[in-house]
Amino acid sequence: MSRNLSIRAKVFLKPLVLFQIIDAYDRRPKGDNQVMGTLLGRTKEDHIEITNCFTVPHKEHSENKRIDLDMAYASEVLELNMFAYPNERVLGWFCTGKSVSRSASLIHDYYVRECGERQPLHLLVDASLKNQRLSTRLYCAVEMGVPGGTKGLMFSLVPLEISSENSDLVAVRCIEKQSQQQASKQMERFVPELVQVVDATRNIQQRLDLLLRYINDVLARKKKPDNLVGRSLQAALTAVPLFDSEKFRLMFNTNVRDMLMAITLSTMIKTQLEISEKLSCMQDQ
């Protein structure tokens, strides 16, 4: 993909990237005013997907407002990421703050080499949550200057759209539901996973009841049939394989057991990491 096409292509951002940036901002070392790192994702013919990122340690020089990246660390983490996600490529870099920093041009030169033929993208995230909103802006550097003279870079805004797949929407809606609960000042724990399954099943049951009422009204000639709705129902029914009730119950119970096992293992790993973090803090003191 050429660099000019990268500027014109639509850019989609996954919510996971924003969560990773916010988490890195909350865990930033004392004295650091911002965090920055590498954006990863996939490029298609007509759009770009930012699907992942990782932070890169940096050093800020207050006297000249310069920022030095740990490029060796960035290269090593990128190499490890390529083993886990071989389809992801470097798309640019992110930074927290309210405006583009003075060192953006120098950082841009580094990511030009990493992106190859693609134009590096610069995602700016204002993690200060002004007005209780997370501001995200996407920039693309454009060369400017007079012919034969000194040339510079101008960071121009690029349209950005936050997209979510069905699996992402479940987590996003759960977080949104918890954020709207202002009953207590302390953050409440998320509801257990099985309760979420029950809520999702109840929601599906309500939608099926609504669908059955519509079909019965059409058969009883109480409502006029809609061809578009009929084709949508046919596509939905043909997309789902026909299972025997006993076979479906066995498959569902197996998936529930797998989910419980995954929850148990993740809880054990989380507890182990918390203990390791506390032990490391005690050693530092």
From Swiss-Prot:
Family as reported in the entry's similarity comment: Belongs to the eIF-3 subunit F family.
GO process terms (BP): formation of cytoplasmic translation initiation complex
Keyword Metal-binding: no
Subunit structure: Component of the eukaryotic translation initiation factor 3 (eIF-3) complex. The eIF-3 complex interacts with pix.
Residues annotated as domain MPN: 11-145
Alphabetical UniProt keywords: Cytoplasm, Initiation factor, Protein biosynthesis
InterPro entries attached to this UniProt entry: eIF3f, EIF3F/CSN6-like_C, JAMM/MPN+_dom, MPN
Provenance organism: Drosophila sechellia (Fruit fly)
One Gene Ontology term, aspect cellular component: eukaryotic 43S preinitiation complex
Signal peptide positions on this chain: none
Molecular function terms, GO-annotated: metallopeptidase activity; translation initiation factor activity; translation initiation factor binding
Protein name (Swiss-Prot/TrEMBL): Eukaryotic translation initiation factor 3 subunit F-2
Location in the cell: Cytoplasm
Record keyword Magnesium present: no
Functional description taken from the UniProt entry: Component of the eukaryotic translation initiation factor 3 (eIF-3) complex, which is involved in protein synthesis of a specialized repertoire of mRNAs and, together with other initiation factors, stimulates binding of mRNA and methionyl-tRNAi to the 40S ribosome. The eIF-3 complex specifically targets and initiates translation of a subset of mRNAs involved in cell proliferation.
